[in-house]
């Protein structure tokens, strides 16, 4: 019994392991380049089903808690390993020993409370290392990164437990492109801990409090090019002269992101910035200013000159006391050297005229996503305002009149670039005034329905994309680039109006086709982007686009964005891949050929009808159809005549004087039906013939040369034959009045020829002695 239980347990373990391996394999997807994605797959361990060909392995957002020495041993070619957001709390010492080619390692947001330098010693090729969000207090007992000579991007720290930075922490690192330190709860900083890094292109420092900021700042001035301070409360910051050290600063850009500041602390920050001799760019993103704009300091000192700062960027600045804010007049003297200013999404509605006049060096001004209107813009662009301004961006404000904007900006003599996109204009006046040097105008997403002469003729670049335009017919002789995508144009613009055009982007309109002639008319065109239109894939269009090899160099979005909209059977297919049949591509020739063939067929039928009396046959067919529509033959009691006599008018003498006399004067007499005597006047002759034949017991045909030349005799013969065929009786009697050669009977008398071949006929004898026998035989034939 114990042996049986042991076997059951072993089998259970094996089955469980096999299921786990199968689950791991199902959670992974690998491509032919060796990139395997297994994120969010509920994996409990690193899969062992992969081969050494794997180069990139993404196992983020799983449930891996432990990495053993053998888990990654086979992945000798691995270059990127992403293990972020698992539950990893333990990594064995030699877990990464086989990863000598690894360049990217992400262990962020796990539960690693202790870091070991032995993990990283084998990683001689490592360039990226992310250790953010793990609950360690320090960066280990020994230097973690001293062996990582190729490391360029390093991210360390956490929001809660990382409290201490030591001098050994960054030993061995000489150059980093990016260093991010989350020191939100930092309590201890050993001087010169960051000074060991000789050069850092971009340092991101998270600090909730500013207590240790100056100590860290001293170590950074000579090694960091771009310093970014995040999530810091500077409301009580105070600059201390004793904290300054290096005067030869390398910092060129200082960014404050999600920082809280007051009027007084900003004054102190200005003091700090004045110590950075090479500072050129200052940026404030998502910051909060708890003040009213009085930056003179509590001791009434003068505002500190920020030095050589040329670029100032402010994005999404929150000012709780916005409606009590001052006019910034205290900062006016500091703005004369600034060349680039961006104030985006910060509720700016006015730049005071006096401030605009102080911005003498300003070349670039971006006031996007603010509250500017024409009236306040006129005050901002007053006389002598922004004398050096070349680029003005007023995207997504509250502007509504193109005419007023152009007139207002006439004071800006050097303005060349204007972006007023994402405002709402709707209407464009026929004429406008603009600065003489205007080269670039952006009117995209302004809801305009048409373009007029309001557009300045001096433009070299025009962007009117994402509007409601269905026609573009402006003459812009200097225009080099036209962006007109996402409109309702149905054809390319007239090339003669744009003789200098180099770039045309006209995607996502309603264009159905364009031709080689149209493209060739743009003599200077180098780039065309016309994808996303509703192309009609005609044979001409396909031939042009598929056979012109040079076209691919001009169409920058070819072939992916060029799809057929019609014909329906190729809708959604790439223009490059569509092939139409010969009948679709040569329809005109095909229709012409069919028409010619039809004409020849009709001509042939006409010749045949004439040759074989086709018209006569059709008449007979019509008569026969009319006869077939009539009721069936009347019963025997309706038979009125013994015989209907069919004869030619030229044989009337023989019929009326001989035949009628012999038969009707015989005892008992025969009753004959003759057309001259018995046809009902006013009745259609065809109906008379049909009725007479149907009311007669027999039909006597008096055959002669005259008979076969008579059309009506032919009708009578055919109807008699139809009767014979339909009623299966022997109603026809042939009387040969004169010898007739069968070959002499016309082909159209096929019935007569057939009857003469199948029936015995009576021949009228010229010998009088034999004529009595003829009449006896005829009477007998009629009675039969």
From Swiss-Prot:
Ubiquitinated at Lys-754 by PPP1R11, leading to its degradation. Deubiquitinated by USP2. Glycosylation of Asn-442 is critical for secretion of the N-terminal ectodomain of TLR2. One of its GO terms (biological process) is cellular response to triacyl bacterial lipopeptide. The record marks 349 as: Interaction with bacterial lipopeptide. Keywords: Cytoplasmic vesicle, Disulfide bond, Glycoprotein, Immunity, Inflammatory response, Innate immunity, Isopeptide bond, Leucine-rich repeat, Membrane, NAD, Receptor, Repeat, Signal, Transmembrane, Transmembrane helix, Ubl conjugation. Residues 1-20 form the signal peptide. Ester-bound lipid substrates are bound through a crevice formed between the LRR 11 and LRR 12. This is Toll-like receptor 2. It comes from Macaca mulatta. The gene is TLR2.
């Amino acid at each position: 019994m114990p042996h049986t239980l042991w076997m059951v347990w072993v089998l259970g373990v094996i089955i469980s392991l096999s299921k786990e391996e199968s689950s791991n394999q199902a959670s992974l997807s690998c491509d032919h380049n060796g990139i395997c994605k297994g994120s969010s797959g509920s994996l409990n361990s690193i899969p062992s089903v992969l081969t050494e060909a794997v180069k990139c392995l993404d196992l983020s957002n799983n449930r891996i808690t432990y990495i053993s020495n053998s888990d990654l041993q086979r992945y000798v070619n691995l270059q990127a390993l992403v293990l972020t957001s698992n539950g990893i709390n333990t990594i064995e010492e030699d877990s990464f020993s086989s990863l000598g080619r690894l360049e990217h390692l992400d262990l962020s947001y796990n539960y690693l409370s202790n870091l070991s330098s032995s993990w990283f010693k084998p990683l001689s090729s490592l360039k990226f290392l992310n250790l953010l969000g793990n609950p360690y207090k320090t960066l280990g007992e020994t230097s973690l990164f001293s062996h990582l000579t190729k490391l360029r991007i390093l991210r360390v720290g956490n929001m809660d437990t990382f409290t201490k930075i030591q001098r050994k922490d960054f030993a061995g690192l000489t150059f980093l492109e990016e260093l991010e330190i989350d020191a939100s709860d930092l309590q201890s900083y050993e001087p010169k801990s960051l000074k060991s890094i000789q050069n850092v292109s971009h340092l991101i420092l998270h600090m909730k409090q500013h207590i240790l900021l100056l100590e860290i700042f001293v170590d950074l001035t000579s090694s960091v090019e771009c310093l970014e301070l995040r999530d810091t409360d500077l409301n009580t910051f105070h600059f201390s002269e004793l904290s300054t050290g290096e005067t030869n600063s390398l910092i060129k850009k200082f960014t404050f992101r999600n920082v809280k500041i007051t009027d007084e602390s900003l004054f102190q920050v200005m003091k700090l910035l004045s110590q950075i001799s090479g500072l050129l760019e200052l940026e404030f993103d998502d910051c909060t200013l708890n003040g009213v704009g009085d930056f003179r300091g509590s001791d009434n000192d003068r505002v500190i000159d920020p030095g050589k700062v040329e670029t100032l960027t402010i994005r999404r600045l929150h000012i709780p006391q916005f409606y009590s804010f001052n006019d910034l007049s205290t900062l006016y003297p500091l703005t004369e050297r600034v060349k680039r200013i961006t104030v985006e999404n910060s509720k700016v509605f006015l730049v005071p005229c006096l401030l605009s006049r102080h911005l003498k060096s300003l070349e670039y001004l971006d006031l996007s996503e603010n509250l500017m209107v024409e009236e306040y813009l006129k005050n901002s662009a007053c006389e002598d305002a922004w004398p050096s301004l070349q680029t003005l961006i007023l995207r997504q404000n509250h502007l509504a009149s193109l005419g007023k904007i152009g007139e207002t900006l006439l004071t800006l003599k050097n303005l060349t670039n204007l972006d007023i996109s994402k405002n709402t204009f709707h209407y464009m006046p026929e004429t406008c005034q603009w600065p003489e040097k205007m080269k670039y105008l952006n009117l995209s997403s302004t809801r305009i329905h048409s373009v007029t002469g309001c557009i300045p003729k001096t433009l070299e670049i025009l962007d009117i994309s994402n509007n409601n335009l269905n026609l573009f017919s402006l003459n812009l002789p200097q225009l080099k680039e036209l962006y007109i995508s996402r409109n309702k144009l149905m054809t390319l613009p007239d090339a003669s109006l744009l003789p200098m055009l180099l770039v045309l982007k006209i995607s996502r309109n309603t264009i159905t086709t364009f031709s080689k002639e149209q493209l060739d008319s743009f003599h200077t065109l180098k780039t065309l982007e016309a994808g996303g239109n509703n192309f009609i894939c005609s044979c001409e269009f396909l031939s042009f686009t598929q056979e012109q090899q040079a076209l691919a160099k001009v169409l920058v979005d070819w072939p992916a964005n060029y799809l057929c909209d019609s014909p329906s059977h190729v809708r959604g297919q790439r223009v490059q891949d569509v092939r139409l049949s010969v009948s679709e591509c040569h329809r005109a020739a095909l229709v012409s050929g069919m028409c010619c063939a039809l004409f020849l067929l009709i001509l042939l039928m006409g010749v045949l009808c004439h040759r074989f009396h086709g018209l006569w046959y059709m008449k007979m067919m019509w008569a026969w159809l009319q006869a077939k529509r009539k009721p069936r033959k009347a019963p025997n009691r309706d038979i009125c005549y013994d015989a209907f006599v069919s004869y030619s008018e030229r044989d009337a003498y023989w019929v009326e004087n001989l035949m009628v006399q012999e038969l009707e004067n015989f005892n008992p007499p025969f009753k004959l039906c003759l057309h001259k005597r018995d046809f009902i006047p006013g009745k259609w002759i065809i109906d008379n013939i049909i009725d007479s034949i149907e009311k007669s017991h027999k039909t006597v045909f008096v055959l002669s040369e005259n008979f076969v030349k008579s059309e009506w005799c032919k009708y009578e013969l055919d109807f008699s034959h139809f009767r014979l065929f339909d009623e299966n009786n022997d109603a026809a009697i042939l009387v040969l009045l004169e010898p007739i050669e069968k070959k002499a009977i016309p082909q159209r008398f096929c019935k007569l020829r057939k009857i003469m071949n199948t029936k015995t006929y009576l021949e009228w004898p010229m010998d009088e002695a034999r004529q009595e026998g003829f009449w006896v035989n005829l009477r007998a034939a009629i009675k039969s």
